[in-house]
């Protein structure tokens, strides 16, 4: 039992104060097997060893370093307020941190000259991508979107036309951890977008508030919002619901688009292609991606497949880069160029004019 438990461990940072020499041990290296990336592939091995220079903690006399409670408060407050000042006027605001929004932010963040703010009303970003369909664990991704998983390093089981991630949370946690480590990205979770900034017929940012405040406007008064200006807004608010498709619904309310017909009945084969193809700048300054595309165009719903969310998000990122005058896959200025398998999503004749 101990051997089986040990073999499931990956390299750990659980090390610190030196143990007395009499009690110190140096365990043997451990071999770890992870799931195969594709069918027929062998296990991926990693090793872990504890050297004498990096011994385990002495848990018999363990103590944290001292700290004043006020320091904790000041560190959190100072950093958050600094972020609010920094991103009050930014290059791109992404509204919604589901699979499309996170994929968009990840692709955008590869350009270090572009600053990105992600606004997510939930405390927990990820939208519906923590699980597959009907609260099941596995995530199905149709090819060629598996190339994005290869880039992220997410393992999967491979079939001829699709791949399966054993738990959807593997994708979401991986893309999120890689994305948020980049210096040009800030996630503002538990923050809701209540409205858009519009000047001269162009979207120029978002109106924000704490999510809990937005949910209680009927019970409290005088809870005015804040604002974030942006050169480009990417709306990835998902399909219809209390917090769904809010971007395009607001565009209809203020007369910038004529209608939001909503999704048609489920048709996976049509839906995923349509969502990628129709990802575009719907009004000046605002790009729509993910399931919100189906809401504005009346495309079929796609059900529990996620490839279109990833590729639609990436396409939205390159549309935003084009709007910013940065190298991108839409006009062919990106180097190296996009993989040939994904180019169909960016062909000029496949992009609907805004």
Curated annotation (Swiss-Prot):
Could you cite one Gene Ontology molecular function of this protein?
iron ion binding
Q: How is it modified after translation?
A: During the catalytic reaction, a sulfide is transferred from Cys-222 to a reaction intermediate, generating a dehydroalanine residue.
Note one Pfam family from the annotation: Thi4
Binding of substrate: at which residues? 100, 120-121, 128, 193, 224, 239, 291, 301-303
Give the main localization category.
plastid
Q: Which reaction does it catalyse?
A: [ADP-thiazole synthase]-L-cysteine + glycine + NAD(+) = [ADP-thiazole synthase]-dehydroalanine + ADP-5-ethyl-4-methylthiazole-2-carboxylate + nicotinamide + 3 H2O + 2 H(+)
| Enzyme Commission number, as recorded | 2.4.2.60
Q: Where on the tree of life does the source sit, at the highest rank?
A: Eukaryota
Identify residues that carry 2,3-didehydroalanine (Cys): 222
One GO term of the biological process aspect: DNA damage response
- Does this UniProt record's set of keywords contain Protein biosynthesis? no
Keyword Transmembrane helix attached: no
The residues forming the transit peptide are 1-45
- Note the subunit structure: Homooctamer.
What PANTHER family does the annotation carry? THIAMINE THIAZOLE SYNTHASE, THIAMINE THIAZOLE SYNTHASE, CHLOROPLASTIC
Q: Report the protein name in the record.
A: Thiamine thiazole synthase 1, chloroplastic
Q: What is the lineage of its organism?
A: Eukaryota, Viridiplantae, Streptophyta, Embryophyta, Tracheophyta
Q: What is the primary gene name for this protein?
A: THI1-1
């Amino acid at each position: 039992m101990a051997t089986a438990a040990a073999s499931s461990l990956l390299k750990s940072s659980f090390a610190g104060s030196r143990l007395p020499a009499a009690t110190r041990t140096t365990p043997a290296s451990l071999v770890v097997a992870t799931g195969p990336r594709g069918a027929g592939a062998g296990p991926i091995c990693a090793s872990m060893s504890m050297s004498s220079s990096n011994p385990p903690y002495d848990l018999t006399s363990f103590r944290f370093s001292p700290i004043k409670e006020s320091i904790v408060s000041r560190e959190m407050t100072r950093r958050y307020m600094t972020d609010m000042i920094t991103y009050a006027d930014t290059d791109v605001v992404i509204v919604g941190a589901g699979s499309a929004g996170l994929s968009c932010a990840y692709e955008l963040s590869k350009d270090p000259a572009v600053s990105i703010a992600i606004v997510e009303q939930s405390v927990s970003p990820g939208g519906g991508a923590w699980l597959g369909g009907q609260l099941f664990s596995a995530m199905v991704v149709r090819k060629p979107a598996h190339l994005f998983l290869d880039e992220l390093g997410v393992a999967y089981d491979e079939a001829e036309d699709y791949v399966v991630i054993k738990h959807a949370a593997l994708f979401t946690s991986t893309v999120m951890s890689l994305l948020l480590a980049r210096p040009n990205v800030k996630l503002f979770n538990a923050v809701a977008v209540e409205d858009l900034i519009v000047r001269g017929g162009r979207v120029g940012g978002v109106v924000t508030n704490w999510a809990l405040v937005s949910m209680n406007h009927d019970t409290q008064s005088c809870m005015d919002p804040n604002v974030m200006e942006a050169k480009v807004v990417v709306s990835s608010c998902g399909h219809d619901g209390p917090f769904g498709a809010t971007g395009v619904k607001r565009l209809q309310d203020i007369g910038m688009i004529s209608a939001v017909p909503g999704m048609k009945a489920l048709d996976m084969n049509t839906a995923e292609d349509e969502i990628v193809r129709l990802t575009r700048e719907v009004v000046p300054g605002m790009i729509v991606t993910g399931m919100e595309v189906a809401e504005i165009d009346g495309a079929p719903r796609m059900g529990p497949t996620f490839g279109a969310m990833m590729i639609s998000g990436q396409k939205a990122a390159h549309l935003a880069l084009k709007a910013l005058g940065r190298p991108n896959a839409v006009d062919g200025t990106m180097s190296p160029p996009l993989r040939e398998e994904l180019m169909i999503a960016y062909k000029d004749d496949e992009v609907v004019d805004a």
